[in-house]
Amino acid sequence: MQPMPKSPLRPGIALAVLVAGHFFASVFMRNLGAGIGEIADPWAAKIAKFFYSAFTFTVGHLAPFMAIFILFVIYRIWRGKNIQWGIDILGVLLTVRCFVIFVLLNLLLLSQLRAGGLLLMQLILFLPVITLNFGWLYWRLDTGARMKGQRHIRFAEDDESPSPFDYFYIATRTLLQFEPTGASGTSRLMKALFVIHGVMMLDLVALTLSRAISLASGG
């Protein structure tokens, strides 16, 4: 039996990226649980505690199954079998976690904290989560479309054969410029994702600056 041709979706790289994203998301939640005592607002502390409790419950009951699932995906990749559905499940889960963490981070930015260490650490942990998540989304959707003779993204350079690095590069640039640079969306779906990604980053920067000004003025 001949091995399957190499997929442009590169399942091995995709799996490594998504596992890294889930790792940072888990560290974010664990750090949130350790710092709940620093949240001075009672309602905000209750919300944070609820999500942390949901996280610990999920980890306690589903972590063994998730580990087995990831090992199964690795085995399929090693055998050269098609496992894109498994990669997509991990990607969708990371997307859900990314948006939940985004909501929690906004909660921290808008709440009164007894110390600033928790907020700073959570901001740092969120950056790789959102970058890896949106980089994977851009890569998965555009490459899937190109395999069907279409495209969702037009790159300024080397548009015929973009590499995985190109997608994560435009996701990283969004951290600094609030919109993907060096590429443009050619479909409503991708344009919507570009806008959502940019708005999320702009929201965090605006709230962070507002919080910094408030602290500097003694508010």
Predicted regions and their residues:
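Hydrophobic alpha-helical transmembrane segments of multi-pass membrane proteins
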Residues: T58-H61, I89, L93, L120-P128, ...
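Alpha-helical transmembrane segments of multi-pass membrane proteins
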Residues: L18-G37, A206
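Perimembrane loop-to-helix junctions flanking transmembrane segments
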Residues: G35-A54
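Membrane-proximal soluble regions of multi-pass membrane proteins
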Residues: R140-S184
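Pore domain of cation channels
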Residues: D166-I170, P180-G219
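Alpha-helical transmembrane segments and their helix-start/interface "positive-inside/aromatic belt" motifs
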Residues: Q2-V17, N82-L90, L119, I124
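Cytosolic-side membrane-entry/anchor segment at the start of a transmembrane helix
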Residues: A54-S111
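Pore-domain transmembrane helices of cation channels
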Residues: V103-T143
